[in-house]
Amino acid sequence: MEMRSKCRKIKMEHGIDMILIDYLQLMSGSSGNDNRQQEVSEISRSIKALAKEMECPVIALSQLSRAPEQRADHRPMLSDLRESGSIEQDADVVMFLYRDEYYNKETEEKGIGECIIAKQRNGPVGTVKMAWIGAHSKFADLDLVHTE
């Protein structure tokens, strides 16, 4: 995996505190597997091994399937992770961002987002409400925004 050698080099030259992978499904596996689910499983396992080798967290962003669009409650679930159940299995933590306002223009929760902690190997799961600041495309602490 080319990424592993780059990370090793960066760690030796500068140190490394965290690795961020923007869009896991754009990566390709080393085996040239024709089955995309198996390939994503291989990638997921190699990311887990990379985190252990580099002794740092790896944050990997993943695309969801279209399943949330088909449900009345559009909140994403673990089963919505695209192309592989191994992402769900291998990850220590899985979090989703959700804004009801995106799907429901009449919502009472305008300017509110949710961080859904769907899996946390060493802790609780649940939902944390946050302020959505659309002008800056960012989330913020709900208490801080509403007290300012």
How would you label these PLM feature ranges?
Residues 24:
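Conserved Walker B
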Residues 1-18, 28, 33, 45-55, ...:
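C-terminal regions of RecA-like/P-loop NTPase motor modules
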Residues 33-36, 40:
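A short, small/polar-residue-rich loop/turn motif at beta-strand boundaries
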